[in-house]
From Swiss-Prot:
Residues 295-304, 366-379 have a biased composition (Pro residues). One of its GO terms (biological process) is regulation of transcription by RNA polymerase II. A zinc finger (SP-RING-type) spans 585-671. Residues 60-79, 380-389, 876-890 have a biased composition (Low complexity). The modification Asymmetric dimethylarginine is found at residues 245, 262. Its main location: nucleus. Expressed most abundantly in testis with lower levels in heart, brain, pancreas, prostate and ovary. GO terms for molecular function: SUMO ligase activity; transcription coactivator activity; zinc ion binding. InterPro entries: Znf_MIZ (IPR004181), Znf_RING/FYVE/PHD (IPR013083). This is Zinc finger MIZ domain-containing protein 2. It comes from the Eukaryota.
Length: 920
């Protein structure tokens, strides 16, 4: 018999090995003393035997898959009469708590004292695959329908790992009968026929009837067929499992009497449940060993229950090698599938109700068509590296966790920590590898770059910084990501999955910092066809989360209602409000009223935060968050209403429209009309035309950050209400002539750029369009923050952008003293630091001339030369690259940066992202 060891090489060491518990194959020692009748259940790992199904079936493998003759647990089976007694066999190593369908076949071997005493008798009640090991094909859910089934599944995982040694003598008689029963192992059926088939060869060969799952059944005796286990496993395996060897299934390889060495048995279960040693001393240690007394606990060979048992098996990685009482120790993986698979103490009641679900096949491992012939694991390609079984033990296995087939190291392209949507901006002089072409017809090329320790640490600590590697067509001036189909990339020997999407415009760049290391890094590019038409570039990029940008814009670009009104009136008076659907929209024709939709032109749902570009001449707004999300992947930054360029730093949040939206937020209105005096009224919805909006909103609205109602002061809402239907316009605006403290310190002042809002702008008469010309370009960035100090302070302490989002409540003016009035006496004051707000949040004030950068140094890099060592390219020509000089400039440092982070950190405009990179 070939021991399973030879297969060992097939299992690459798990990348996440447990250190001392390497996948060492632990040979099962066979004790000469073991009675021929005893059989052991062993789960073997990926060793693939040549044995065919018949072989497997023929071998009277113990439940563990070891030949019945050999005692997998030498110590246990060997001399221990206890095990020998049928009782022991009866106990299933693991109670399959599953659906209560443990392999409870009471009967045959159940040991009286053993709680749950169901014996192994129950084959894996899996139905055709007595073992419940679905053959490679997915096991029909019905397989597990039997009472034993559900539990079996769960238990199977567990049981597969436990070795049950017991005498089979008594069973022999039934064996032949039961084999036939395998297919339908009823709860009452005994495992014995299968697992116990002792009698050596006598084990009946499994009839085809065993069938796919039969295989599994067969496996029981001979060892679970690897794949059989797989399929189910596979899915369940999730990448975690996928990579792992499926330890449990003994591959039918070794003939019966031979002990199957446990390959891949990684750690003794004892680590986890030391006390529970199955088969301890030949008997289940009564104390802990008893796996859930749930109904029969099937012996170890778990049939491949779809994925569920996988975990056990893995977790079980028991070192069967331990002779003697140790038997297998199960490390229960915490709940498997999170479904009740908790091994209580020793109870492995895996209740996996879902087991019946279709089995999932493990990616990377072919399923072998013949039940008896396990297919050796294929070397997982870039997709799923072998993973250490431990992982399961560490975290509960969620019920239907699907493996991420992309790869362990798939690049987090569009999503950063917290899976937040992120915008991407190049950092000036942040190019690490200048755009390069591949050498003609060079299949594999290596490109080396250096990362200093300080740079590496900064990258890792800052979720908003990334190393972006992308490919683009040489004629594309926009450098939009486009990956030729034949390109494959790996970094430091870690294959990366390229997201190409459905069309060439949806390709995504790779983000490499998670696979980089301090010092030398190598990008290996493999192509199967010439890619001379494309260029590759590696650059540092700033990737702030949409939430942080949204917050920055709310603070810096919330255009006060009075200014919005003035702007609208000016546009009415000029007779040019392009892009609005109202009547008489032609230039030079006086407009009486304009219809404005309350729906975002991007999502066609009610706008939450109304915004426009600074240069837009229309009243119609779009939803700010939807617009930011729209520009996450390929930032075109064009207004969806008029198609003018609307860059991030030029966006304005319209407080007037926001007030209207809040005022009618609980109604179904879809449009309003606005007249030249800025009075507004809702347009009634025609009942037959109206389709109620879905309450949950569009998919884009995932990061709804703040409740817009909290952004407006009560006085603003009074003004909006006054402008609404039936109210005297502007009435509420008179009182503000007395400056009221406001946490929107100087709404106007924040826009007082040179010539932007003249000092003559009278706070008490917003209706007069005295706002001189709006400066053609976006106002300077150093706007004072326009939101309550509570929000500002909450951000000061946060270092990670995703966490900077203050709860919506923080924006609620009622939480901040001094927020009552919208107007401040400073509206007419000259721009600059001398703007004194009645209630300035001390820490948040800074002179207008200073760019605001967050405490995290959001995008602040001070000039650092040679931060990244000279990158060199090898393979496509070893031309060394000059050292990368990261200059102190960002794409629009004065304009962009202050929007992206909290404004608490005064920094020089010359500072930029690279300031975080140390020079040493």
């Amino acid at each position: 018999m070939n021991s399973m060891n030879p297969m060992k090489p097939a299992l690459p060491p798990a990348p996440h090995g447990d250190g001392s518990f390497a996948y060492e194959s632990v040979p099962w020692q066979q004790s000469a003393t073991q009675p021929a009748g005893s059989l052991s259940v062993v789960t073997t790992v990926w060793g693939v035997g040549n044995a065919t199904q018949s072989q497997v079936l023929g071998n009277p493998m113990g439940p563990a898959g070891s030949p019945s003759g050999s005692s997998m647990m030498p110590g246990v089976a060997g001399g221990s009469s206890a095990l020998t007694s049928p009782q022991c066999l009866g106990q299933q190593a693991f109670a399959e708590g599953g659906a209560n369908k443990g392999y409870v076949q009471q009967g045959v071997y159940s040991r009286g004292g053993y709680p749950g005493a169901p014996g192994f008798t129950t084959g894996y009640a899996g139905g055709p695959g007595g073992l419940g090991l679905p053959s490679h094909a997915a096991r029909p859910s019905t397989d597990f329908t039997q009472a034993a089934a559900a539990a079996a599944v769960a238990a199977a995982a567990a049981t597969a790992t436990a070795t049950a040694t017991a005498t089979v003598a008594a069973l022999q008689e039934k064996q032949s009968q039961e084999l036939s029963q395998y297919g339908a192992m009823g709860a009452g059926q005994s495992f014995n026929s299968q697992f116990l088939q002792h009698g050596g060869p006598r084990g009946p060969s499994v009839p085809a009837g065993m069938n796919p799952t039969g295989i599994g059944g067969v496996m029981g005796p001979s060892g679970l067929s690897p794949l059989a286990m797989n399929p189910t496993r596979a899915a369940g395996m999730t990448p975690l499992y996928a990579g792992q060897r499926l330890p449990q299934h003994g591959y039918p390889g070794p003939p019966q009497a031979q002990p199957l060495p446990r390959q891949g048995v990684k750690r003794t279960y004892s680590e986890v449940y030391p006390g529970q040693q199955y088969l301890q001393g030949g008997q289940y240690a009564p104390s802990t060993a008893q796996f859930a007394p749930s109904p029969g606990q099937p012996p170890a060979p778990s049939p491949s229950y779809p994925g569920h048992r996988l975990p056990l098996q893995q977790g079980m990685t028991q070192s069967l090698s331990v002779p003697g009482p140790t038997g297998l120790h199960y490390k229960p993986t915490e709940q498997f599938n999170g479904q009740g698979a908790s091994f209580n103490g020793g109870s492995v009641s895996y209740s996996q109700p879902g087991l019946s679900g279709p089995t999932r096949s493990i990616p990377g491992y072919p399923s072998s068509p013949l039940p008896g012939n396990p297919t050796p694991p294929m070397t997982p390609s870039s997709s799923v590296p072998y993973m250490s079984p431990n992982q399961e033990v560490k975290s509960p296995f969620l019920p239907d966790l699907k493996p991420n087939l992309n790869s362990l190291h798939s690049s987090p392209s569009g999503s950063g920590p917290c899976d937040e949507l992120r915008l991407t901006f190049p950092v000036r002089d942040g190019v690490v590898l200048e755009p390069f072409r591949l050498q003609h017809n060079l299949a594999v090329s290596n490109h080396v770059f250096q990362l200093r320790d300080s740079v590496y640490k900064t990258l890792i600590m800052r979720p908003d910084l990334e190393l972006q590697f992308k490919c683009y067509h040489h004629e594309d001036r926009q450098m939009n990501t486009n990956w030729p189909a034949s390109v494959q990339v790996s970094v430091n020997a870690t294959p990366l999955t390229i997201e190409r999407g459905d069309n060439k415009t949806s390709h995504k760049p790779l983000y490499l910092k998670h696979v980089c290391q301090p010092g030398r890094n190598t990008i290996q590019i493999t192509v199967t066809a010439c890619c001379c038409s494309h260029l590759f570039v590696l650059q540092l990029v700033h990737r702030p989360s949409v939430r942080s940008v949204l917050q920055g814009l709310l603070k810096k670009r919330l255009l006060p209602a009075e200014h919005c009104i003035t702007k609208i009136k000016r546009n009415f008076s000029s007779g040019t409000i392009p892009g609005t659907p109202g009547p008489n929209g032609e230039d030079g024709v006086e407009q009486t009223a304009i219809k404005v939709s309350l729906k975002c032109p991007i999502t066609f749902r009610r706008i939450q935060l109304p915004a426009r570009g600074h240069d837009c001449r229309h009243i119609q707004c779009f939803d700010l968050e939807s617009y930011l999300q729209l520009n996450c992947e390929r930032g075109t930054w064009r207004c969806p209403v008029c198609n003018k360029t609307a860059l991030l730093e030029g966006l304005e949040v319209d407080q007037y429209m926001l007030g209207i939206l809040i005022y009618i937020q609980n109604s179904d209105y879809e449009e309003i009309t606005i007249d030249p005096t800025c009075s507004w009224k809702p347009v009634p919805v025609k009942p037959d035309m109206h389709i109620k909006e879905e309450p949950d909103g569009p998919a884009l609205k995932r990061c709804r950050t703040v409740s817009p109602a909290h952004v407006l002061m009560p006085s603003v809402m009074e003004m909006i209400a006054a402008l609404g239907p039936g109210a005297a316009p502007f009435a509420p605006l008179q009182p503000p002539s007395v400056p009221a403290p406001s946490d929107y310190p100087g709404q106007g002042s924040s826009f007082l750029g040179p010539g932007t809002f003249p000092e003559s702008f009278p706070p008490t008469t917003p209706s007069t369009p005295t706002l001189a010309e709006f400066t053609p370009g976006p106002p300077p960035i150093s706007y004072q923050s326009d939101i309550p100090s509570s929000l500002l302070t909450s951000e000061k302490s946060t270092a990670c952008l995703p966490s900077q989002m203050a709860p919506a409540g923080h924006l609620d003016p009622t939480h901040n003293p001094g927020t009552p009035g919208l107007h401040t006496s400073n509206l007419g004051a000259p721009p600059g630091p001398q703007l004194h707000h009645s209630n300035p949040p001390p820490a948040s004030r800074q002179s207008l001339g200073q760019a605001s950068l967050g405490p995290t140094g959001e995008l602040a890099f001070s000039p650092a030369t040679g931060v990244m060592g000279p990158p060199s390219m090898s393979g496509a020509g070893e031309a060394p690259e000059p050292a990368l000089d990261l200059l102190p400039e960002l794409t629009n440092p004065d304009e962009l940066l202050s929007y992206l982070g909290p404004p608490d950190l005064p920094t020089n405009n010359n500072d930029d992202l690279l300031s975080l990179f140390e020079n040493n």
